[in-house]
Curated annotation (Swiss-Prot):
Any one cellular-component term (Gene Ontology): cytosol
Protein family (similarity comment): Belongs to the adenosylhomocysteinase family.
A GO biological-process term: S-adenosylmethionine cycle
Binding residues annotated for NAD(+), in chain numbering: 203-205, 237, 266-271, 289, 324, 345-347, 390
PANTHER family: ADENOSYLHOMOCYSTEINASE
Compartments, as annotated in UniProt: Cytoplasm
Annotated organism of origin: Prochlorococcus marinus (strain MIT 9303)
Pathway: Amino-acid biosynthesis; L-homocysteine biosynthesis; L-homocysteine from S-adenosyl-L-homocysteine: step 1/1
Cofactor note: Binds 1 NAD(+) per subunit.
Function: May play a key role in the regulation of the intracellular concentration of adenosylhomocysteine.
Alphabetized NCBIfam families for the sequence: ahcY (TIGR00936), PRK05476.2-3 (NF004005)
Matching InterPro entries: Adenosylhomocyst_ase-like_sf, Adenosylhomocysteinase-like, Ado_hCys_hydrolase_NAD-bd, NAD(P)-bd_dom_sf, S-Ado-L-homoCys_hydrolase_CS
Protein name (record): Adenosylhomocysteinase
Gene: ahcY
Cofactor needs: NAD(+)
Length: 476
């Protein structure tokens, strides 16, 4: 090894990444290469837009699970001209070899699997801190944490009392990180907020946050709701969860699903996919729902629709997928049968009241798998500490379905960055013709061939031959 003179070493900037092991980069690169073959939408966008660089000048702060599939998304954004900084949106979802591969390519990445809450918020701050002292001008979010950090931080600049009463462990870490940053730079967040041209949001929970800000008149920039693109919600949420839920449960527990009684709480698109996956492996599946329409859908599919408090003692596998909080509360947890498996596939960890279990005896079996002894003497198996089981205990959705979602993300970033001045400070969805384009880009990969309308047929149903084929109000 050649020694670096002290004078030279002092001039070297610290690495613009935090990853578990940069030596995993080669492994990550091999998996990225395989994933690219399963992500035709993203690869098509590289071909279509690579020469024109529609994202040149975009500074994208990305907060989304740092997986292999996300690596393909990041490199697509870079290929289209963007400058990108990235953190994960979940403390357990990072694939360390993926983070290493992207960091080794020169993209600043701040993500490790199993990071602490303090580290999580420190890393989220890092994606907002451009090396030249500048700021991001775009946010690509999953769950709304990056957007929420900017918004809460800007409020705290003028009223620090918003940080006085954290409601849980997560908020304690978040509020402390904001106080630390404000002590260093009292206008950090408002400066970033004023420079953001737009936000694209990946998931149901983050979209709900955006609509809340819009309703209260607090949304300071336009946002695109990627989640409600048909080629996202009806594919990622449904078919992705149909494969990744049981992958996470089985990797974590090696349990035989056949013959078990499972309860899926929430029968939206995520719940529908989750229920199908468990039924497909032979479980008896029940559904808990608050929405009469979703409940009726579940009943018509042959599922028993039940109340949690009436069946809790009979269930072997609990899955929350509601986007709400304290869906499974302490009063339910303490009544569970011995060796019941408890997990969540909604975005945040508060669907299950994990905090109420902290004083009980915990035995860690392996990463993200804990045995908890209840007052009754029964033990339950908690997966991923109540966070996303498919990413905490497995590797998330398959590449092909994520290509649908991430193609929407790239199109949304291009739209807001290049045409942001045409958008008011509201939440939008991508137009139907782009939704259909995303679907078209994925058909050839799976050998699907579209039938084409004749002009007479198109005229008869009053649609263009090339689409769009459905009105915006159509429910797929």
């Amino acid at each position: 090894m050649v020694a670096v003179p002290t004078s030279m070493a002092s001039l070297q900037a610290p690495p613009q990444y935090v990853v578990a092991d940069i030596d995993l980069a080669d492994f990550g690169r091999k998996e990225l290469s395989i994933a690219e073959t399963e992500m035709p939408g993203l690869m098509a966008l590289r071909v279509k837009h690579g020469s024109e660089k529609p994202l040149k000048g975009a500074r994208i702060a990305g907060s989304l699970h740092m997986t292999i599939q996300t690596g393909v998304l990041i490199e697509t954004l870079v290929a289209l001209g963007a400058d990108v900084r990235w953190a994960s949106c979940n403390i357990f979802s990072t694939q360390d070899h993926a983070a290493a591969a992207i960091a080794a390519s020169g993209v600043p990445v701040f993500a490790t699997k199993g990071e602490t809450l303090d580290e999580y918020w420190a890393y989220t701050h890092r994606i907002l801190e451009w090396g030249d002292g500048g700021t991001p001008n775009m946010i690509l979010d999953d769950g709304g944490d990056a957007t929420g950090l900017v918004m809460l931080g800007s409020k705290a600049e003028s009223d620090s009392s918003v940080l006085d009463n954290p409601g849980n462990e997560e908020e304690t870490a978040l509020f402390a990180s904001i106080r630390t940053k404000l002590a260093q730079d009292s206008s950090f967040y408002s400066r970033i907020k004023s420079n953001i041209q737009g936000v694209t949001e990946e998931t149901t929970t983050g979209v709900a946050r955006l609509y809340q800000m819009q309703k209260s008149g607090e949304l300071p920039f336009p946002a695109i709701n990627v989640n409600d693109s048909v080629t996202k919600s009806k594919f990622d949420n449904l078919y992705g969860c149909r494969e990744s839920l049981v992958d996470g449960i089985k990797r974590a527990t090696d349990v035989m699903v056949a013959g078990k009684v499972a309860l899926v709480m929430g029968y939206g698109d995520v719940g529908k996919g989750s229920a199908q996956s468990l039924r497909g492996l032979g479980a008896t599946v029940m559904i808990a729902e608050i929405d009469p329409i979703c409940a009726l859908q579940a009943a018509m599919e042959g599922y028993r629709v039940v109340r949690l408090d009436e069946v809790v003692q009979d269930v072997d596998i609990f899955v929350t997928s509601t986007g709400n909080f304290q869906v499974i509360r302490h009063e339910h947890l303490i009544r569970m049968k011995d060796e019941a498996i408890v997990c969540n596939i909604g975005h945040f960890d508060n669907e299950i009241d994990v905090a109420s279990l902290k004083d009980y005896s915990w035995e860690n079996i392996k990463p993200q798998v804990d045995h908890i002894t209840l007052p009754s003497g029964n033990k339950i198996i908690l997966l991923a500490e109540g966070r996303l089981v498919n990413l905490g205990c497995a590797t998330g959705h398959p590449s092909f379905v994520m290509s649908n979602s991430f193609t929407n993300q790239v199109l949304a970033q291009i739209e807001l960055f290049s045409k942001g001045d045409k958008y008011a400070d509201q939440v939008y969805v991508l137009p139907k013709h782009l939704d259909e384009m995303v679907a078209r880009l994925h058909l050839e990969k799976i050998g699907a061939r579209l039938t084409e309308l004749t002009k007479q047929q198109a005229d008869y149903i009053s649609v263009p031959i090339e689409g769009p084929y459905k009105p915006d109000h159509y429910r797929y």
